[in-house]
A protein has these predicted regions:
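Generic N-terminal amphipathic, Lys/Arg-enriched alpha-helix
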Residues: 1-15
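Conserved, mostly hydrophobic/aromatic
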Residues: 20, 43, 73, 133, ...
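Flexible, glycine/charged-enriched surface loops at secondary-structure junctions
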Residues: 36-37, 202-209, 325-328
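Active-site loop/helix belt of alpha/beta enzymes
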Residues: 130, 136-247
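Active-site loop ensemble at the mouth of alpha/beta enzyme cores that anchors a bound cofactor
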Residues: 216-288
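C-terminal accessory subdomain/extension
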Residues: 262-352
């Protein structure tokens, strides 16, 4: 028998299925209009069942941040997987190669040594691993820094046993709503990708995939002439600080909290940093007249312009979705105020 959301335990992670599905449809429509593909980033939720719902149409495979996520998605039957991270640890390389024996696996590479290690692991496993050369597009984290460096690396990958050169990737994850000149910075990053792509093609090296962008740069990614696919993940659920970016996506996930103490001008909730991610700021309390003042490990303090009764349920909207999911064992799927089922967050903690 279906139950109402009011029967869920406090601190539960909740996903509005209608909004989640609407977000997927909105992305699909835009991708089709601009001729782009999507590779949803599963670091957002680490939940294979949700990843499967995102696939189909313009979404042909998923993006993973860790080998653990890669393994969890492959075990659930998802067989087109990009690991958008450089891996050099021997044990992790062996695990990647094992997955590649039964699934299509692409891995970001930005160094000769990294390519050599990946090739050796592929040969030992008898598998083929596709490579995306990672280009630094302004994040100053991973990625080759010049077109000549990319050309040299591409030539090595083409000659390396067990490796297949599939294309390029470049991710600029810091361009949130508050970043000045965000569009110009994104365009500059795409220009770096275009320069590398042009240099490779001049040398007769085919570039198939050019992967990049994310939710905060979704609109810019659609308009980019160089990108073939977008790595967005948060688009399906959204975060508080993405509201000002003119995106067609709706807020779809919350955490349930309960008022456990009241003051003359506020209230205390029983959910804190151990229940909701706060890297991008305080969560929002979806309660009229209330705002979040402070959040501790197990409590959230509210300022309230009207009296709030003990036991009042308050939905908190997170500023950071991926870390919120990684704090929970399961997510409850709802339609309206009716709970349909719970889904295990299978790759929770899979940062290995």
């Amino acid at each position: 028998m279906a139950q109402g959301i009011e029967h869920l335990p406090s601190r539960s992670r909740v996903l509005d299925q209608d909004r989640f599905e609407d977000n997927i449809k909105a992305a699909e429509n835009l991708l089709g209009s601009f001729g782009k593909l999507m590779r949803p980033h599963v670091k957002t939720h680490r939940t294979p069942e949700l990843a499967r719902l995102q696939l189909g149409g313009r979404a042909r495979g998923v993006t993973c941040a860790t080998v653990g996520e890669l393994e969890a998605m492959a075990a659930a039957g998802i067989d087109d997987l990009l690991l958008a991270n450089e891996i050099v640890s021997p044990d992790k390389l062996e695990r990647i190669a094992a997955v590649a024996a039964t699934s299509r696996v692409l891995v970001a590479v930005d160094s000769m040594r990294g390519a050599q290690l990946l090739s050796a692991a592929a040969v030992r496993a008898g598998s083929n691993i596709e490579v995306l050369i990672d280009v630094d597009v302004g994040l100053n984290r991973c990625g080759v820094r010049s077109a000549p460096e990319a050309v040299a690396l591409a030539r090595m990958v083409l000659e390396a046993p067990g490796l297949i050169l599939a294309g390029l990737m470049g991710y600029e994850g810091r361009l949130r709503a508050a970043v000045a000149d965000r569009v110009q910075k994104f365009d500059a990053g795409c220009e770096s990708l275009e320069q590398v792509k042009s240099a490779l093609e001049t040398e007769g090296i085919k570039v198939g995939i050019v992967s990049g962008a994310g939710t905060s740069t979704f609109n810019e990614g659609l308009r980019s002439p160089v990108l073939t696919e977008i790595q967005a993940g948060t688009y399906a659920m959204m975060e508080a600080d993405l509201d000002g970016l003119d995106l067609p996506f709706k807020r779809a996930c919350t955490v349930i909290a309960t008022v456990i103490s009241v003051t003359s001008d506020g209230a205390v909730l029983d959910a804190g940093r151990k229940s909701i991610g706060c890297e991008n700021g305080l969560p929002e309390a979806l309660l009229p007249g209330a705002s979040v003042l402070k959040i501790n490990e197990e409590h959230t303090l509210l300022s309230c312009h009207r009296p709030v009764a003990l036991g009042t349920r308050v939905m908190l909207f997170p500023s950071k979705v991926p870390t919120t999911f990684n704090l929970h064992d399961r997510v409850w799927l709802i339609r309206g105020n009716v709970v349909e089922r719970s889904v295990p967050i299978t790759a929770r903690g899979r940062s290995d």
